[in-house]
A protein has these predicted regions:
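C-terminal beta-signal and adjacent terminal beta-strands/loops
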Residues: 231-233, 318-325, 349-404
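Face-selective signature of the C-terminal outer-membrane beta-barrel domain
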Residues: 9-174, 179-183, 221-227, 270-272
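Outer-membrane beta-barrel translocator domains and adjoining extracellular loop/strand segments
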Residues: 1-3, 41-50, 55, 95-104, ...
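Residues on the lipid-exposed face of transmembrane beta-strands in outer-membrane beta-barrel proteins
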Residues: 15-19, 70-76, 121-127, 169-173, ...
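Gram-negative outer-membrane beta-barrel transporters
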Residues: 127-136, 142-144, 222, 227-231, ...
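Membrane-embedded beta-barrel scaffold of Gram-negative outer-membrane proteins
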Residues: 25-46, 172-189, 204-257, 262-264, ...
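Transmembrane beta-strands of outer-membrane beta-barrel pores
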Residues: 35-39, 78-80, 89-95, 141-147, ...
Length: 404
């Protein structure tokens, strides 16, 4: 990131209304409305030293965001058929003020940056054709109107309207205790605030994906396999060259899958293991797709008698040698290959009563030094070469959850 987050103020509220069993077939009407406000400060001096030898500048930014959301959904049930339909609304406004060379920012007024208005409608239906076969399908349309408040009125890039179509079809079938599924879908999204900040001429992103898998449960054993393949047209990719960040649309391919198994080998005891891998390619540049995680293997052992619980997790991640330096997304960009690592964690819990649960644990038990491949990069504005940032060492944590 170009700056460090030094102060954060977040406020949010939501209201929800639900009416059930309106008629024998009109089973539920749900209405939600909410608002969130984010006001935070990012700077180059609160959490780092400024060197007089470098090209660092003492500066700060105070962005502010207000988001209003609405959701209305109706659910209908007939014999063997479930139908859900509704509309969504979002109003998103971004403002900011900043300081350069230490003159301060609190006395300055906020300046509008970008604003978004989104309306959407959706419908999803499920048909239980038999005890072993089910069809699910859905469609959604959104219209997103985006505006650059900083551009003059007659600038051709000031206003953008994105019409977004998404839909899917899925088949689920159970044969001899094994549940199979297969699906195909298309999803479109508009560039967000940060992507539009890097380029004013981005097209909407479209992901065409197929997925399939199976789930098998027999006695004390659970097993599942899932596979997917996607063709992403106009994938929105951010690219960093020095201090400059730009965004463009590319063609991308993603393939991946996960295998998972669990075995309850004794009363209260369970052992589990999973293996996941994703392959990504940037077809436009004929190179690996940035920010694609490497092969990961997880193994767990848990004990739980519904009052007390304990468990260990062994996580093994392979080295990632498929990377695209400088390319990625708003979270981070690739900076080179990463080494493999393994970590061990321990956790325990006590269900005090039906309202409260106390949990605690130790992450990275052996205090290993390691870094994730998909992680935030360092700050080039500080005059430093971008390096991979290690994850925390041994961590102790305690959490109390109370529900009413």
């Amino acid at each position: 990131r170009m700056m460090d987050g030094s102060k954060f103020d977040r406020d949010a509220w939501n209201v929800r209304f639900v009416q059930r069993n309106i008629t024998p077939w009109f089973t539920e009407l749900e209405l939600r409305y909410g608002q969130s406000k984010i006001d935070h400060v990012m700077d180059t001096y609160s959490m780092r030293y400024l060197s007089m030898m470098g090209n660092q500048v003492k500066k700060a930014m105070n962005p502010k965001r207000e988001t209003n959301t609405g959701h209305l959904k109706a659910t209908f049930d007939w014999p063997d058929i479930n139908l859900q339909t509704g509309i969504d609304y979002m109003r998103d406004k971004h403002l900011s003020r900043m300081e350069m060379n230490g003159e301060g920012y609190r006395h300055k007024p906020y300046q509008p940056q970008q604003n978004f208005t989104q309306w959407g409608g959706f419908v999803e239906g499920a048909w239980t054709a038999s005890d072993s076969r089910k069809f699910i399908s859905g469609y959604r349309y959104d219209e997103v109107k985006a505006e650059y408040d900083t551009l003059i009125a007659n600038n051709p890039n000031k206003h953008h309207t994105y019409g977004l179509h998404s839909g899917f079809f899925r088949l689920e079938e159970e044969i001899n205790g094994i549940k199979y599924y297969a699906g195909v879908g298309i999803a479109e999204r508009a560039p967000d605030y940060w992507e539009r900040g890097a380029s004013q001429v981005l097209d909407k992103e479209q992901n065409r994906q197929i997925d399939t898998g199976l789930m098998w449960k027999i006695d004390t054993f659970d097993f599942s396999v899932s596979l997917f393949g996607s063709d992403v047209r106009d994938f929105i990719m951010l690219e960093r060259v020095g201090k400059d960040v730009s965004a463009r649309n590319i063609k991308a391919t993603r393939l991946g899958g996960e295998i998972e198994g669990k075995w309850k080998f004794a009363r209260h005891w369970e052992i589990g293991s999973s293996l996941a891998y994703t392959y990504g390619k940037n077809r436009t540049d004929d190179r690996p797709l940035a920010q694609t995680p490497p092969l990961e293997w997880k193994n767990s052992l848990t004990w739980d008698n519904e009052t007390l619980s304990a468990g260990v997790l062994w996580r093994v991640v392979s080295a990632q040698k498929r990377y695209a330096t400088g390319q990625g997304n708003i979270i981070g960009q690739d900076i080179g290959a990463s080494a493999g690592f393994g970590t061990l964690s321990f956790n325990t819990g006590w269900k005090i009563n039906k309202y409260a649960t106390l949990q605690g644990g130790i992450d990275n038990l052996f205090n290993k030094s390691y870094a994730e491949f998909v992680s935030k990069g360092a700050d080039p504005s500080a005059g430093l070469q971008t390096v991979r940032v290690n994850e925390p060492g041994r961590q102790y944590w305690l959490r109390l959850q109370v529900q009413f």
